[in-house]
From Swiss-Prot:
Name of protein: AP2-like ethylene-responsive transcription factor CRL5
Keyword set includes Nucleus: yes
Record organism: Oryza sativa subsp. japonica
InterPro entries in alphabetical order: AP2/ERF_dom, AP2/ERF_dom_sf, DNA-bd_dom_sf
Organism taxonomic ancestry: Eukaryota, Viridiplantae, Streptophyta, Embryophyta, Tracheophyta
UniProtKB keywords: Developmental protein, DNA-binding, Nucleus, Repeat, Transcription, Transcription regulation
Role of this protein: Acts as a positive regulator of adventitious (crown) root formation by promoting its initiation. Promotes adventitious root initiation through repression of cytokinin signaling by positively regulating the two-component response regulator RR1. Regulated by the auxin response factor and transcriptional activator ARF23/ARF1.
Description of what induces expression: Induced by auxin.
Amino acid sequence: MTNSNNGNGGTNAAASGWLGFSLSPHMASSTMDEHHHVHHHQQQQQQQQQQQHHQQQQHGLFFPSVTTAAAAAAYGLAGDVVAATNGYYSQLASMPLKSDGSLCIMEALRRTDQDHHGPKLEDFLGAAQPAMALSLDNTSSFYYGGGGAAAAGHGQHGYLQACDLYGGPAAPSLVTAADEEAAAAAAAMASWVAARGAATAYATGAADANAAENVLPSATAAQHLHHPLALSMSSGSLSSCITAGEYGMAAVAAADGGRKRGGAGGGGQKQPVHHRKSIDTFGQRTSQYRGVTRHRWTGRYEAHLWDNSCKKEGQTRKGRQGGYDMEEKAARAYDLAALKYWGPSTHINFPLEDYQEELEEMKNMTRQEYVAHLRRKSSGFSRGASMYRGVTRHHQHGRWQARIGRVSGNKDLYLGTFSTQEEAAEAYDVAAIKFRGLNAVTNFDITRYDVDKIMASNTLLPADLARRNAATTTSKDDHSAAGAGAIVSVHSAADIAVADTLWKATTAPRQQQQHHDDVVLSGADQAAFSVLHDLVAVDAAAAHQQQQQQQHMSMSAASSLVTSLSNSREGSPDRGGGLSMLFAKPSPAVAASAQQQASTKLMAAPLPLGSWVSSPPASARPPAVSIAHMPLFAAWTDA
């Protein structure tokens, strides 16, 4: 009897058009055993129903028959049946479900009698029936729709006699209607099994048959056993019982055990867990040398040196001694920095004997200066190819950018883009002096910059304005050169006139030798300006044209004087040198030598009058006038 309870419950639900699920655990059995029990209970159907009804009346225990007709009457689906049974309803084997799997409790469940309460969840899960395992697994839940042709022998298998839940047998017509509907449901079940195939029918039918056999006891045993319903909600692999007695727990355990044994071949082996590779291992950062790391993206090597003193300056990360293409070069840079910071007793990568020359070099430098020296000798850094501190090269347009770090909230400050890396390095130096004072590590010598001017400014000065005395010195030189040029240009004409008057006054008493004196005057003029030519490098013109010679000499003297003043910083008048030094009165020995040189040049100079003019003796010629006696230059020097 018990083997076909579930099967007929599902088929009766199919005949009434309801969606239902089977009240059975998952047990494994064979299809042949199910058919054997079905035929066996077909022969004993009437006798068992009468015996069950008689026992229920004697002991007062009500295990009402759960027929589809009774369910339809309870839910108001068959009006004539409800009227015949006076609104009776039974413990349902096929529960209506919503689309989400929850129970559908309809208003039609309420009784018409006001003295009786409506059905509650306890009516479905109460203790007035034998313990049953309720499973929602898809392997034993059947959903049917529609009816089929009648088939004899499946009417009452697994169903108790329809009785009122509150006492009294149901009408005999209810049993007759249930037999007809059960036969139609059996035919629908047969067609469904054929459609699903032998494999599905085997798995489903075996599970239902064995579940009914192991869970539902006989009617006689049910009279003395009172167990609560064991509710098991299974997802196919595990069963979690909410409330269950000893009998229900045993049934669920047996069902789960059989299913686990059946699936041990496929899911019993534990799959190995593959851990995902950490993202930190993207690119190797290790090196065989101490203090050297390999940049993750560029592949270049960096030398790092960590010193606790850098924490005082707000630095929270390792100091970098530059980037290198070769791992060995980076290791040697670390060794040199470590030797400077911690001495010869520290651990280094290479023998100490390899650094004897560098040890002598670093004695004259401070730590920061030597680290800056190491950085300048590196082949650039990982983010740029510049050898200067704080300078990187833009990866798109190739221009040089200057940045200084850890100046405003431990962030980098962008200083601008420059055409050359030297300009960017100067911009970094100015910013470093502004934010870090005299202890700043700069790319160039700090004496190159006007530190006081940089510190006093409210903004970052451009590099050309921050250089020490660069603008002041240039302006002074320009002013001195311009002044000297103006003086020479103003007095050039007066210079020529005074010199001409002087020569004429000297030769005036000798009128008897007019022709000879003119020649001597021409020669003396040439000799006087030859001395000036020796001093300021004036190239004289031909000596036979006096006016042309004087004009040329005056212009060349002015040009040479301006050139001399502009090329020498000591040439400015306010420095106490220059023209006073150049045109100071010579000593007697120097004057005598100049006169002798002038006489020699006068004798060697070609005369325009021809070879018939004889040269006068040295005693008859007037002495050459030295440049120290010229009134123009004497007045200018005294001023």
